[in-house]
From Swiss-Prot:
Protein name stated in the entry: Fatty acid metabolism regulator protein
One Pfam short name: GntR
GO molecular function: DNA binding; DNA-binding transcription factor activity; fatty-acyl-CoA binding
Subcellular localization: Cytoplasm
Underlying gene: fadR
Organism: Klebsiella pneumoniae subsp. pneumoniae (strain ATCC 700721 / MGH 78578)
SUPFAM superfamilies cross-referenced by the UniProt entry: GntR ligand-binding domain-like, Winged helix' DNA-binding domain
Keywords: Activator, Cytoplasm, DNA-binding, Fatty acid metabolism, Lipid metabolism, Repressor, Transcription, Transcription regulation
Start and end residues of each HTH gntR-type domain: 6-74
Keyword Zinc appears in the UniProt entry: no
Length: 239
């Protein structure tokens, strides 16, 4: 186990998470007693206690007063906030994780974009208008793309969609910085935003589904070609 952390708390958190991932502390098992675990990791009990509370909030553990701390099946108990952690833990599965993330984005955005156009077209157009002045480089497009999808999610009037996008932000924007290094990807995105604006202005809400699905397919093809050059630190630096 190789852990790179800057603080005792960070070290303890990564030690426990990687131990859960590697089944040293398998789901359903009980963590060692606080004194034993603090000595094993090499941190104070106060630091360990803070770390355990944080991991419990993220769904890795269940803390029950007066009872041992239980290791959860994190797939069933955690939220989107652990996406970056999963990418860092299992480098080989990063492409599949990213495919799943982008599939979810496409599926839910067909719903919230159509709703935004139908119920709050002025807000939706204001979000899309931000694409007019974007600088032509990867970082700017990664930020723009995330902000457009997030902005349209909130423009739908259902803030839950926005919260879902919030949970995706870390991994989403990191992927975006690699994806939008391609001029073809940037051009495709600008065309997509422009088409969305035209559909919104014309009130053609029923065209959103096909437009978003087609963009998901076309951008997916570019992404799959780029996966061969996926930077090795895409997951490694996620912490």
């Amino acid at each position: 186990m190789v852990i790179k952390a800057q603080s005792p708390a960070g070290f303890a958190e990564e030690y426990i998470i990687e131990s859960i991932w590697n089944n040293r502390f398998p789901p359903g098992s009980i963590l060692p007693a606080e004194r034993e675990l603090s000595e094993l990791i090499g941190v104070t009990r106060t630091t360990l206690r803070e770390v355990l509370q944080r991991l419990a909030r993220d769904g890795w553990l269940t803390i029950q007063h007066g009872k041992p701390t239980k290791v959860n099946n994190f797939w069933e108990t955690s939220g989107l906030n652990i996406l970056e952690t999963l990418a860092r833990l299992d480098h080989d599965s990063v492409p599949q994780l990213i495919d799943n993330l982008l599939s979810v984005r496409t599926n839910i955005s067909t719903i919230f974009i159509r709703t935004a156009f139908r119920q709050h077209p002025d807000k939706a157009l204001a979000v899309l208008d931000s694409a007019r002045e974007v600088e032509d480089h990867a970082d700017a497009f990664a930020e723009l793309d995330y902000n457009i999808f997030r902005g349209l999610a909130f423009a739908s009037g259902n803030p839950i969609y926005g919260l879902i996008l919030n949970g995706m932000k870390g991994l989403y924007t990191r992927i975006g910085r690699h994806y939008f290094s391609s001029p073809e990807a940037r051009s495709l995105a600008l065309g997509f935003y422009h088409q969305l604006a035209k559909v919104c202005e014309a009130g053609l809400h029923d065209q959103v589904y096909e437009l978003v699905r087609r963009y998901g397919h076309d951008s997916g093809e570019i992404w799959h070609r780029m996966q061969k050059s996926l930077p090795g630190d895409l997951a490694m630096n996620m912490r």
